[in-house]
Amino acid sequence: MINRMNPSVKFVMITVSMIAMAFFFNPWTPLVFFMGVVLIQLLFATVSWKTWSLMMLPFLLGAVGYFWTTLVFGNEDSTLGTALSLSFRVLAFSSLSLLFVFTTKPVEFILSLMQQLKLSPKIAYSILVGYQFLPVLKDEFFQIRQAQQLRGVEVPKSPVKRVTAMRHLLIPMLAGAVRKAERTAFAMEARGFTGEGDRDFYRKITIGRADAAGSLLILVLLCGSMAAGWLL
């Protein structure tokens, strides 16, 4: 169900939830919210749990770091509660963000922003073109590096020298990216693209029952988390 939600509706609901969670400083509200997001992801979403665990690991380490530093260097009056609140808040926000990332297709998200939230087509198509260029830039990076190795350019062993040597790779990549962007702009203008907001779409992103059910589910979780913070 979460995978079938309109990306704009999902984005608005997640943004509202994050803003609302920012006003609660007790540890129970973010903890209940985090557990609820994981439960929603388990029952109503299709994600790769292995990838989710790997992506969640840095946030988990960050939450542990927040807990430790606040516990050691915080005010003695409310050290434990503040430490738990900060660490659980990191987990709640990160799990909600990953839920959006793993259940939303980037192209559908941009199309939905244009159709539902009236994002400027100039900005939207610029983002789409940049997104499509990412695999091309990756291939060009390896091609340029292999070409330099064939010409006898050695890869430095020192991490600092390796970073400074990246400029020999980045300059050709940036030059190629500028040429591709210019050709893409000329091609879009030749096909009649003007950037006007009033336009027809071949692929329409609609709002349906899954959006109502998913929004209601997120609102119930948000209200339940707030109630848990008040009662516990």
Say what each PLM segment does.
Residues 1-27, 33-40, 143-232:
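Transmembrane alpha-helix interface motif
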Residues 2-3, 43-51, 74-82, 203, ...:
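Membrane-helix interfacial "entry" motifs
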Residues 26-34, 50-55, 79-80:
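Short, aromatic-rich membrane-interface segments at the entry and exit
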Residues 27-28, 47-49, 118-123:
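Membrane-helix interface segments
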Residues 36-46, 61-67:
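Alpha-helical transmembrane segments and their membrane-interface exit regions
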Residues 55-160:
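Juxtamembrane/interface alpha-helical elements of multi-pass membrane proteins
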